[in-house]
């Protein structure tokens, strides 16, 4: 996010008038002077790198800023401060600091910076990830948790098992298109959980594509500096005939609301007929009055789960494919565990999950090794705070460096290696890592903003990964001399919503000759 701010700022400067540049400089100067006066009068912020006058540290951040954050951690410690054009920023880099602030002081550290375009105009204040810490956020969060907690997530398991069978069948038919199959499976699985839709037949399904485009639009709108209204909030009150950006944003909100409410109406009709399967939306409708939610709020809460959930799950499955290509010994060990329990007459199911500790550890390692959200969405302090002698003023942006915490050598020795055994003791029992909410990593976030869909996501990753390991070998292609052509360990791309491996080649081959017949039989008997 900060790196995109740099690109946005450069583009705006290049296209702005001299008067606009002078106005921006004056505003930034006033903000910086005010921030310094207030900060120095109350205490000293954590140390950090020296920046430029007015602009601070924004030009010191590369395209993938978590790498630079991790370097600064070594220089300045687990908590350091930055200046983004007058806005104070604090970056948290250790489990201890995150636990002290985002967990134990969550009432101060659970708010969001104001996203006028993304959080107010485009979404009407109903996108939970951008919603400020207040009454609306609490009721959306409570309703979402009721439909996605550990117990509630179990009712989606039959749908997820069906999706895993379809993923395996599609992978068998077109192994070279494995990435497209992963994207289809991720989108279809979350759509089934949210709306009880039948399996999607292609990765670019029209409805899911519309939701994906909405999520990308929101991510772009949330980038600092993307819209001038974020710097001058009074511009939000301009009439639409004077502000094209506002007019277009409101029109997008109208269209997206119409789409989501249409999905809501379809579920409501099936519920009225008595012919419906369990889904997140059905549960939200059943508890709508109790939770004090409007039709529009339920529609947006459900609809936006698809975009966020599909992208992150597909990216994590891509990380799994990369890891298996690079670490064949890990793949073979997981396959041996599956074979010993499941055999070749059936696919793994959720009933096998408690008896597949190494596969479960492998899922954790996928999420730790290359987190698809290395820093997440910034938070904002809602009041002044002091921590270990440092002053953190109200309105400070707070960034949790998930990348650094998942690679803390004190917790994860040889952190750059893909090693599921790190989550198991000598007897094969799960090791609890403090401060991770039983996950073994911090990829799902912290405190009151921890990902509410993590249980559904963990289920989807487990059943898809177990099915793929049961059916296939995933290997590096070989050159003319038979030498494996290994993909890059570090070539990743930031797609706005997720951080995922750059396109790479791998070879997907069936582990047994009659797997197609077995899959057809399993699907027929399901």
UniProtKB/Swiss-Prot annotation:
Keywords: Heme, Iron, Membrane, Metal-binding, Monooxygenase, Oxidoreductase, Transmembrane, Transmembrane helix. Its EC number is 1.-.-.-. GO terms for molecular function: heme binding; iron ion binding; monooxygenase activity; oxidoreductase activity, acting on paired donors, with incorporation or reduction of molecular oxygen. InterPro entries: Cyt_P450, Cyt_P450_E_grp-I, Cyt_P450_sf, Cytochrome_P450_fung. Its cofactor is heme. The chain crosses the membrane at residues 13-33, 115-135, 306-326. One of its GO terms (cellular component) is membrane. It is a multi-pass membrane protein. It is found in: Membrane. Pathway: Secondary metabolite biosynthesis. Pfam families: p450 (PF00067). It comes from the Eukaryota. SUPFAM superfamilies: Cytochrome P450. It is an enzyme of class 1 (oxidoreductase). Heme binds at residue 451. Cytochrome P450 monooxygenase that is able to use delta(6)-protoilludene as a substrate to produce delta(6)-protoilludene-8-ol. Belongs to the cytochrome P450 family. This is Cytochrome P450 monooxygenase 253. The lineage of its organism: Eukaryota, Fungi, Dikarya, Basidiomycota, Agaricomycotina. The gene is CYP253.
């Amino acid at each position: 996010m900060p790196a995109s701010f740099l690109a946005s700022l450069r583009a705006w400067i290049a296209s702005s008038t001299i008067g606009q540049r002078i106005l921006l400089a004056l505003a930034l100067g006033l903000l910086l002077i005010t921030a310094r006066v207030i900060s120095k009068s109350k205490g000293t912020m954590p140390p950090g790198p020296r920046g430029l006058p007015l602009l601070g540290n924004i030009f010191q951040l590369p395209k993938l800023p978590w790498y630079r954050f991790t370097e600064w951690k070594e220089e300045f410690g687990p908590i350091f401060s930055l200046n983004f054009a007058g806005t104070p920023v604090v970056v948290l880099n250790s489990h201890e600091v995150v636990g002290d602030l985002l967990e134990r002081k969550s009432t101060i550290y659970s708010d969001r910076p104001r996203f006028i375009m993304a959080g107010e105009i485009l979404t009407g204040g109903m996108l939970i990830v951008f919603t400020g810490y207040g009454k609306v956020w609490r009721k959306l969060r409570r309703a979402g948790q009721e439909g996605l907690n550990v117990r509630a997530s179990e009712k989606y398991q039959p749908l997820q098992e069906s999706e895993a069978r379809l993923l395996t069948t599609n992978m068998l038919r077109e192994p070279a298109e494995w990435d497209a199959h992963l994207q289809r499976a991720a989108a279809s699985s979350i759509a089934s959980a949210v709306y009880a839709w039948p399996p999607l037949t292609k990765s670019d399904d029209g409805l899911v594509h519309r939701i994906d485009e909405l999520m990308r639009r929101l991510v772009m709108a949330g980038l600092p500096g993307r819209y001038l209204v974020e710097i001058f909030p009074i511009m939000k009150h301009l009439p639409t005939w004077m502000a094209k950006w506002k007019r277009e944003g409101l029109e997008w909100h109208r269209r997206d609301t119409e789409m989501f409410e249409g999905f809501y109406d379809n579920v409501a009709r099936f519920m009225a007929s008595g012919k419906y399967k369990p889904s997140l939306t059905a549960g939200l409708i059943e508890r709508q009055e109790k939770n004090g939610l409007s039709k529009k709020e339920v529609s947006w809460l459900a609809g936006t789960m698809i975009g966020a959930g599909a992208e992150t799950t597909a990216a994590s499955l891509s990380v799994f494919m990369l890891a298996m290509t690079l670490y064949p010994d890990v793949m073979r060990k997981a396959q041996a565990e599956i074979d010993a329990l499941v055999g070749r007459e059936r696919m793994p199911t959720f009933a096998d999950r408690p008896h597949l500790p190494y596969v479960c550890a492998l899922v954790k390692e996928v999420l730790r090794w290359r987190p698809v959200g290395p820093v997440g969405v910034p938070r904002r302090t809602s009041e002044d705070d002091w921590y270990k002698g440092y002053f953190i003023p109200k309105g400070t942006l707070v960034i949790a460096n998930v990348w650094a915490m998942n690679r803390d050598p004190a917790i994860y020795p040889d952190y750059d290696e893909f090693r599921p055994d790190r989550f198991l003791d000598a007897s094969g029992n799960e090791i609890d890592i403090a401060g991770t909410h039983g996950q073994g990593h911090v990829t799902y976030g912290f405190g009151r903003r921890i990902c509410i869909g993590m249980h559904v996501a963990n289920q989807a990753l487990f059943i898809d990964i177990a099915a793929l390991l049961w059916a296939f070998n995933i290997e590096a292609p070989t050159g003319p001399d038979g030498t494996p052509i290994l993909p890059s360990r570090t070539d990743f791309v930031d797609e706005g919503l997720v951080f995922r491996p750059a396109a790479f080649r791998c070879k997907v081959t069936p582990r047994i000759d009659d797997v197609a017949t077995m899959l057809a039989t399993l699907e027929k008997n399901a």
